A protein has these predicted regions:
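A cross-family phosphate/adenosyl-ligand binding-site feature
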Residues: 1-128, 135-183
């Protein structure tokens, strides 16, 4: 079907990029000055206060924030503006400006990986706008950094089959050149 065809084509494009002559750019040091970072927020509601604590770690970087539709229900734009040093907070975007928009950033950070985002990105599914941007950034071989720790902590050891599936998807992200980091 079309979904499988799109996935096969996208995998072929990624394999072309993965040739030794086209290695991904090294992730800039996000804690130092000079990095221009896009922080993407999804609707992981239980991580709201953690986000405000963790964003301070980017004190030396210039960063913007992009909110998914789910994040717009969790985060108030005015509160984000008052509690962070984000230069810009984006709540709407289009497919047509994707490349131009992403070219401004040295790295994209998905602050908290939701199960939905993990599934979309690891399968190269771009039917949500935020995941489309994340996959496109990954295809362009620029650093994509995600934190899966909250997702892993949420599932815990009680569901081994689910954890195995999640770990396989995280491993696939690593194969694609995504840096999966703890908080």
């Amino acid at each position: 079907d079309n979904k499988n065809l799109i996935e096969l084509i996208t995998r072929e494009v990624l394999s072309t990029f993965n040739k030794p002559s086209a290695k991904p750019q090294a992730a800039p040091s996000l804690k130092q000055g000079g990095a221009n970072v896009l922080v993407v927020l999804t609707g992981v509601s239980n991580m709201r206060e953690v986000f405000y604590r963790e964003i301070e770690k980017l004190s030396g970087a210039k960063y913007d924030i992009l909110l998914s539709d789910g994040a717009k229900a969790v985060f108030d734009k005015n509160e984000l503006a008052s509690k962070t040093r984000a230069a810009n907070i984006y709540t709407s975007f289009q497919y047509s400006d994707r490349s131009e928009f992403l070219n401004k950033y040295d790295a994209v950070v998905l602050a908290f990986m939701s199960l939905s985002a993990l599934t979309h990105i690891s399968s190269l599914n771009t039917d949500s706008m935020v995941c489309n941007y994340l996959v496109w950034h990954m295809i362009s071989k620029k650093p994509l950094i995600v934190s899966a720790e909250p997702l892993l902590n949420q599932i815990g050891d009680t569901r081994p089959a689910i954890m195995r599936e999640i770990n396989q998807k995280i491993a696939k992200l690593s194969e694609f050149g995504v840096s999966v980091v703890p908080l």
